[in-house]
């Protein structure tokens, strides 16, 4: 649901209610037709997808807070589903995720949900898990152990967004998380090709990382 943020940005720039209408219609349809069950846990409700939605939903809803289309009825539906996501991620079994980028994406989403809902148990649990995961997954030289530039930068995105959110909420940032972000950002400095893209190693796309470097410089200055 990354495109929900794009809809929000379009709404913020234009004020055109068609973007709010699309957001409400698509999200309502998704919530009503994609329930959490044993089958959906294999596809649309894998923990990694639920974690990614935690970020995208809580970010995108803010763009539409002044739209009349985001009414009490919709917010009740939205909040109930967000609570379901939070409980699902909070109770997720801790297996391979501890040493996988999946775990970071899951608990990064749990952090966003915890802050959005004011659920301290979610927020604190997410931070403890994230701190453990970056210590296990990030080598001393700053490289993510799965040896994929794309996975490296997905994890770095989550770590930077964690720092950003904690700064915005005036909360203490765990030192291990900040240290991991600095090391990972410096890896991007070394990795970046002349065209600004990351190398195509492992399961990687040819993605420009200059925006990631800019965010790193701002947050870690």
Walk through the language-model features, giving the residues of each.
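Short amphipathic alpha-helical/adjacent loop interface patches that line ligand
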Residues: 27, 86, 185
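A short structural micro-motif
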Residues: 29-30, 132-133, 187
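Active-site lining segments of carbohydrate-active enzymes
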Residues: 35-150, 154, 160-164
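Non-membrane alpha-helical segments in proteins
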Residues: 1-13, 25-33, 48-63
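Alpha-solenoid helical repeat scaffolds
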Residues: 6, 13, 33, 63-70, ...
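Carbohydrate-active enzyme catalytic cores, enriched for enzymes
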Residues: 150-221
């Amino acid at each position: 649901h990354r495109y929900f943020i794009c809809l929000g940005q379009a709404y913020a720039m234009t004020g055109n209610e068609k973007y709010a209408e699309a957001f409400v219609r698509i999200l309502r349809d998704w919530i009503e037709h994609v329930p959490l069950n044993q089958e959906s846990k294999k596809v649309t409700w894998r923990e990694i997808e639920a974690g990614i939605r935690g970020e995208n939903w809580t970010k995108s809803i803010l763009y539409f807070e002044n739209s009349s289309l985001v009414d009490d009825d919709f917010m009740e539906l939205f909040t109930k589903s967000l609570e379901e996501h939070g409980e699902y991620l909070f109770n997720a079994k801790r297996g391979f995720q501890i040493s996988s980028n999946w775990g970071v994406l899951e608990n990064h989403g749990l952090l966003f949900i915890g802050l959005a809902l004011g659920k301290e148990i979610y927020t604190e649990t997410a931070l403890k898990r994230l701190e453990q995961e970056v210590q296990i997954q990030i080598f001393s030289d700053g490289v993510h152990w799965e040896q994929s530039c794309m996975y490296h930068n997905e994890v770095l995105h989550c770590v930077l967004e964690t720092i950003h959110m904690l700064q915005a909420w005036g909360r203490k940032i765990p030192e291990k998380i900040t240290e991991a972000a600095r090391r990972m950002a410096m890896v991007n400095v070394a990795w970046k090709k002349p065209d600004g893209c990351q190398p195509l190693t492992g399961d990687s796309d040819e993605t420009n990382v200059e925006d990631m470097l800019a965010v790193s410089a701002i947050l870690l200055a």
